[in-house]
């Protein structure tokens, strides 16, 4: 059944010159390395005739070759593994097409001698063998074609899959059909964006402008139809949601866009997804929504990803709020951002923290700072304010070092290693800034005089 694909693999493989270290395939090809591995499946010097053990060993060799990116060797093993399609074990025989597709497509994608024609041939044969996997294979085949810039071929592939049916339609089959339709919608969205770009270069009075506008409207209707069913199904559908919302906004359907994004972010049937809240926030921001609404959206994002880049915007919104609860949360947000190693050189975060610490301490909210510092007192000094970091930060970015030095001085006192190191640096341009920092630390530090860290 798979002899044609076997021939394709044979073409890809290159035999070794030494026939003694090879195994002859049914197609007459010598397979290097295979002989010694087959010999490993022996008992008392005799080859096991057990079909399952042979194919199991072959599968292990394929997986090992894939992990090592040995595509040619994997192709050779794959040629032998095709016999699993004739396995006497019903379960294994039924599972074989999906395994062969996954392994074979991986090999053909990366093999240096593979090409689009070979991949297409393999995909088409696998669709007919593994009918239960038809939709999955069709979708992955389309993605492969997209990767190679073959948009029309990918679209035809998806259109064919869209109308395919096998037996009674199951719920899993319905989701796959929706996914196929949604990817078709993405292709239509791509065409729509190109038309939009062309439209932006035309004069509104131009005849071509009206024609392209009509084409775009038609394209957007098709896209909406194809994407709608999928985004109502619980799941993570970021690229589809973004595309759909962009078109809704372009045609002035703000209510439709808002409803879509709100459902995507808050519907409990959908999995937790930080991007859903990001998209909603960005939309509301474009709409110039009230600060309270923006804060409510970012508050949930903060709970999911406290180190998200939008947390600095969240802090700014909280800082400008009139409620003490928000202002206090604004301090927590900054500390939590800087709890993450990936943010320890974020100069904006350190600037915000330095400025906000001063503002809070002037406003007599000493206890807010103490509360945040209590849980960090034992690990932040080594994490942020060691002698090593003082030297490293000063060498890399003097502005960052100065901001951190002020924060270190406020939290740990003027005896802090980081603060003392920066204070001793002889830098003509920053001399006045360091002098002012010294005075500020003396004024605002939360550490009792005489305490050194």
Curated annotation (Swiss-Prot):
Q: Which GO terms describe its biological process?
A: transcription by RNA polymerase I
Identify the domain of life. Eukaryota
Which molecular function terms from Gene Ontology are attached? DNA binding
Name the UniProt key words of this record, in alphabetical order.
DNA-binding, Nucleus, Transcription, Transcription regulation
**Signal peptide limits:** none
Main location per the UniProt record: nucleus
Write down the InterPro entries for this protein, in alphabetical order: RNA_pol_I_TAF1A/TAFI48_chr (IPR016629), SL1/TIF-IB_Component (IPR052669), TAF1A (IPR039495)
From the Swiss-Prot or TrEMBL record, state where the protein is found: Nucleus, Nucleolus
> Has keyword Flavoprotein?
no
Cellular component aspect of the GO annotation: microtubule cytoskeleton; nucleoplasm; RNA polymerase I transcription regulator complex; RNA polymerase transcription factor SL1 complex
Record function comment: Component of the transcription factor SL1/TIF-IB complex, which is involved in the assembly of the PIC (pre-initiation complex) during RNA polymerase I-dependent transcription. The rate of PIC formation probably is primarily dependent on the rate of association of SL1/TIF-IB with the rDNA promoter. SL1/TIF-IB is involved in stabilization of nucleolar transcription factor 1/UBTF on rDNA. Formation of SL1/TIF-IB excludes the association of TBP with TFIID subunits.
Q: How does it assemble?
A: Component of the transcription factor SL1/TIF-IB complex, composed of TBP and at least TAF1A, TAF1B, TAF1C and TAF1D. In the complex interacts directly with TBP, TAF1A and TAF1B. Interaction of the SL1/TIF-IB subunits with TBP excludes interaction of TBP with the transcription factor IID (TFIID) subunits. Interacts with UBFT. Interacts with CEBPA (isoform 1 and isoform 4). Part of Pol I pre-initiation complex (PIC), in which Pol I core assembles with RRN3 and promoter-bound UTBF and SL1/TIF-IB complex.
Q: What is this protein called?
A: TATA box-binding protein-associated factor RNA polymerase I subunit A
**What organism does this protein naturally occur in?**
Mus musculus (Mouse)
UniProt lists the gene as Taf1a
């Amino acid at each position: 059944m798979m002899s044609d694909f076997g021939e394709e693999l044979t073409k890809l493989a290159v035999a070794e010159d030494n026939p003694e270290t090879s195994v002859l395939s049914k197609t007459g090809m010598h397979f290097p390395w295979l002989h010694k591995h087959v010999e490993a499946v022996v008992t008392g010097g005799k080859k096991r005739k057990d079909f399952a053990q042979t194919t199991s060993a072959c599968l292990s060799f394929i997986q090992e070759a894939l992990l090592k990116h040995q595509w040619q060797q994997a192709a050779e093993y794959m040629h032998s593994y095709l016999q699993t399609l004739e396995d006497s074990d019903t379960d294994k025989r039924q599972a074989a097409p999906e395994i062969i597709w996954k392994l074979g497509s991986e090999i053909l994608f990366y093999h240096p001698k593979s090409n689009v024609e070979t991949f297409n041939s393999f995909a088409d044969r696998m669709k007919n063998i593994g009918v239960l996997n038809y939709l999955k294979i069709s979708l992955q085949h389309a993605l492969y074609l997209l990767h190679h810039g073959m948009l029309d071929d990918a679209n035809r592939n998806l259109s064919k899959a869209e109308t395919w049916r096998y037996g009674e339609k199951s719920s899993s089959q319905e989701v796959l059909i929706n996914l196929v339709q949604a990817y078709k919608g993405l292709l239509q969205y791509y065409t729509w964006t190109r038309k939009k770009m062309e439209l932006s270069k035309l004069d509104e009075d131009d005849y071509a402008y009206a024609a392209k506008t009509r084409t775009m409207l038609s394209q957007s209707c098709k896209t909406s139809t194809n994407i709608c069913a999928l985004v109502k199904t619980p799941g993570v559908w970021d690229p589809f949601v973004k595309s759909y919302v962009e078109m809704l906004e372009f045609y002035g359907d703000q209510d439709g866009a808002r409803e879509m994004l709100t459902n995507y972010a808050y519907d409990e049937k959908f999995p937790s997804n930080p991007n859903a809240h990001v998209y909603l926030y960005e939309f509301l921001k474009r709409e110039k929504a009230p600060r309270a609404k923006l804060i409510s959206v970012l508050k949930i994002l903060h709970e999911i990803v406290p180190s998200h880049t939008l947390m600095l915007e969240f802090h700014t919104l909280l800082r400008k709020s009139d409620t003490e609860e928000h202002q206090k949360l604004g301090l927590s947000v900054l500390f939590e951002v800087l709890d993450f190693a990936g943010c320890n050189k974020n100069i904006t975060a350190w600037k915000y923290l330095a400025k906000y610490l001063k503002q809070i301490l002037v406003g007599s909210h000493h206890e807010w700072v103490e509360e945040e510092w209590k849980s960090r007192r034992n690990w932040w000094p080594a994490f942020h304010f060691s002698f090593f970091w003082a030297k490293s930060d000063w060498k890399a970015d003097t502005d960052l070092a100065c901001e951190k030095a002020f924060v270190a001085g406020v939290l740990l006192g003027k005896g802090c290693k980081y603060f003392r190191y920066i204070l001793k640096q002889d830098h003509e341009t920053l001399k006045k800034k360091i002098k002012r920092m010294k005075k500020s630390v003396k004024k605002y530090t939360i550490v009792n005089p005489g305490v050194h860290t």
